[in-house]
């Protein structure tokens, strides 16, 4: 297995938007000092220090001579891949050791974003080990004995991390869950309690699960720093009463480029009426996304079962829409925020939001108009399946389906 390393620091902000983390190679001893054999890093040394707001919180120590198997058990021994085991050394024992551990693992995954599994060692009697295993953030290696004296080897899995395993509540990429917003109540539930509901509207006539309440307009619902772009991305439930939100939305919809795809050009009254219909519709939520606080575009996420699209793709399209499957739409409004990498970051984040807000969501679909320039971009930058062209009442579209397992395995979170 090829391990990526870097000789420079990597800095990012946490989902709270204020805390800054830096991971960088350990500093070499000053020329005037005589480094010891234990502290002098060689050219191949890949120990890394993790800083939170310029304070050292942990060090990842690696011994290239100690390797363990990272291929799953079904792989033949002669084909199995191995990687060096890293050891996390926390700078001090504090009540927030678990939080610092998660931050250090976050930094490690951004540093080695092309890996699927990272082996680490941790003392078996440590509360940190209990945190890692019980939350699913790490799993004991099935190839190493659990030695209670010498510690055990744990495997960090990329897909578990980005699904939110072990994430501190205050640092989740998902910033709002109304069903768990009452302090002291309901936070133990991993998902909104399932109960039947019914929708009859237009082309829709279906039973479906009752959906949780949406956060209040203006609420940040998702937040993540995008390393490749060097900016922080936020998804906010659009607030039509906020002049900044509304003027940006109206300007985008009235532009020639956006109108070609969305066909929603019109006076302010039309835009206000549309956003109000979105606000009161329990199956959909309108979002405005911002780069470093600057409005950049618009999106919609919704529950697919009770969406108008569902009845037109339920046959001969190669998909089954489940009770908790979702769908999304994306509109990049500002010209300066266009481009493949930014689109990939926004699209990945919107899909990430969908999968995080309900772990029972197994699929997120999209149906852009077939002739839009974003169609090949979607096919290129998202690990989703292009199913077929479908005829909807208002457009001829391309049906895309993104599966949960593939997203967390192949999604680009860097």
Swiss-Prot record:
Domain of life of the source: Eukaryota
Active-site residues, record numbering mapped to chain: 367
Region (Disordered): 16-47
Biological process terms in GO annotation: siderophore biosynthetic process
UniProt binding sites for substrate: 329
Pfam families in UniProt: Acetyltransf_8
Comp. bias (Polar residues): 16-25
Enzyme Commission numbers on file: 2.3.-.-
Pathway(s) annotated for this protein in UniProt: Siderophore biosynthesis
GO molecular function ontology, one term from the record: N-acyltransferase activity
Family: Belongs to the lysine N-acyltransferase mbtK family.
Function: Acyltransferase; part of the gene cluster 14 that mediates the biosynthesis of a ferrichrome A-like siderophore which may contribute to organismal virulence. The first step of siderophore biosynthesis is performed by the HMG-CoA synthase (HMGS) MYCGRDRAFT_54740 which catalyzes the generation of HMG-CoA and CoA using acetoacetyl-CoA and acetyl-CoA as substrates. The enoyl-CoA isomerase/hydratase MYCGRDRAFT_76805 then catalyzes the conversion of HMG-CoA to methylglutaconyl-CoA.
PANTHER family named in the record: LYSINE N-ACYLTRANSFERASE C17G9.06C-RELATED
The protein's name: Acyltransferase MYCGRDRAFT_85486
């Amino acid at each position: 297995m090829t391990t990526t390393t870097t000789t420079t620091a990597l800095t990012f902000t946490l989902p709270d938007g204020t805390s800054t983390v830096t991971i960088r190679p350990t500093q070499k001893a000053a020329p005037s000092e005589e480094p010891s054999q234990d502290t002098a890093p060689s050219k191949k040394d890949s120990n890394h220090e993790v800083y939170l707001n310029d304070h050292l919180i942990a060090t990842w120590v690696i011994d290239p001579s100690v390797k363990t198997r990272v291929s799953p058990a079904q792989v033949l021994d002669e084909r199995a891949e191995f990687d060096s085991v890293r050891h996390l050394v926390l700078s001090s024992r504090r009540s927030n050791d678990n939080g610092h551990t998660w931050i250090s693992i976050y930094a490690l995954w951004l540093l080695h974003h092309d890996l699927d599994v990272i082996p680490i060692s941790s003392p078996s009697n440590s509360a940190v080990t209990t945190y890692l295993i019980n939350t699913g953030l790490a799993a004991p290696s099935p190839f190493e004995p659990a030695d209670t004296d010498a510690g055990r080897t744990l495997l960090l899995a990329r897909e578990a991390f980005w699904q939110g395993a072990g994430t501190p509540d205050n640092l989740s990429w998902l910033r709002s869950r109304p069903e768990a917003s009452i302090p002291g109540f309901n936070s133990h539930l991993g998902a909104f309690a399932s109960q039947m509901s019914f929708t009859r509207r237009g082309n829709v006539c279906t039973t479906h699960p009752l959906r949780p309440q949406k956060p209040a307009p203006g609420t940040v619902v998702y937040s993540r720093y995008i390393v490749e772009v060097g900016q922080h991305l936020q998804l906010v439930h659009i607030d039509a009463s906020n002049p900044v939100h509304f003027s940006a939305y109206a300007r985008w919809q009235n532009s020639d480029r956006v109108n070609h795809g969305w066909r929603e050009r019109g006076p302010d009254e039309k835009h206000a009426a549309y956003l109000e219909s979105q606000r009161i519709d329990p199956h959909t939520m309108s979002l405005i996304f911002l780069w470093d606080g600057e409005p950049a575009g618009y999106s919609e996420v919704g529950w697919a079962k009770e969406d108008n699209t569902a009845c037109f793709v339920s046959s001969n399209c190669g998909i089954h829409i489940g009770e908790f499957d979702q769908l999304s739409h994306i509109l990049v409004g500002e010209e300066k925020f266009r481009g493949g990498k930014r689109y990939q970051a926004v699209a990945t984040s919107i899909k990430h939001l969908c999968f995080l807000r309900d772990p029972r969501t197994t699929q997120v679909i999209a149906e852009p108009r077939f002739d839009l320039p974003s169609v090949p971009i979607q096919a290129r930058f998202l690990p989703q399946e292009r199913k077929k062209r479908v005829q909807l009442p208002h457009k001829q579209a391309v049906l895309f389906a993104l599966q949960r397992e593939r997203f967390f395995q192949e999604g680009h979170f860097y």
